[in-house]
Swiss-Prot record:
The lineage of its organism: Eukaryota, Metazoa, Spiralia, Lophotrochozoa, Mollusca. Omega-conotoxins act at presynaptic membranes, they bind and block voltage-gated calcium channels (Cav). It comes from Conus textile. This is Omega-conotoxin-like TxO4. Its main location: secreted. TxO4 is found with and without hydroxyproline and these two forms have a bromotryptophan. Truncated TxO4 is found with and without bromotryptophan, and these two forms have no hydroxyproline.
């Protein structure tokens, strides 16, 4: 039981150490990531996650059985809603 706990703690420590040392060489890399995320929260247009280039706009044919890209709205009944 003690050995299992020691192994679990060691794995968690090594995993955390890997993530800490995997940061780019800049001394304020974590701060830059935080500021970028905060900027995207304050300005949703700056976020790349909000844009979908692989979806069909409303009115386009979307198919009966998911032929082609999905609709941007998520609703498909022969044509995107």
């Amino acid at each position: 039981m003690k050995l299992t706990c020691v192994v679990i703690v060691a794995v968690l420590f090594l995993t955390a150490w890997t993530f800490v040392t995997a940061v780019p060489h800049s001394s304020n890399a974590l701060e830059n990531l935080y500021l970028k995320a905060r900027h995207e929260m304050e300005n949703p247009e700056a976020s790349k996650l909000n844009t979908r280039y692989d979806c069909e706009p409303p009115g386009n044919f979307c198919g009966m059985i998911k032929i082609g890209p999905p609709c941007c709205s998520g609703w498909c009944f022969f044509a995107c809603a």
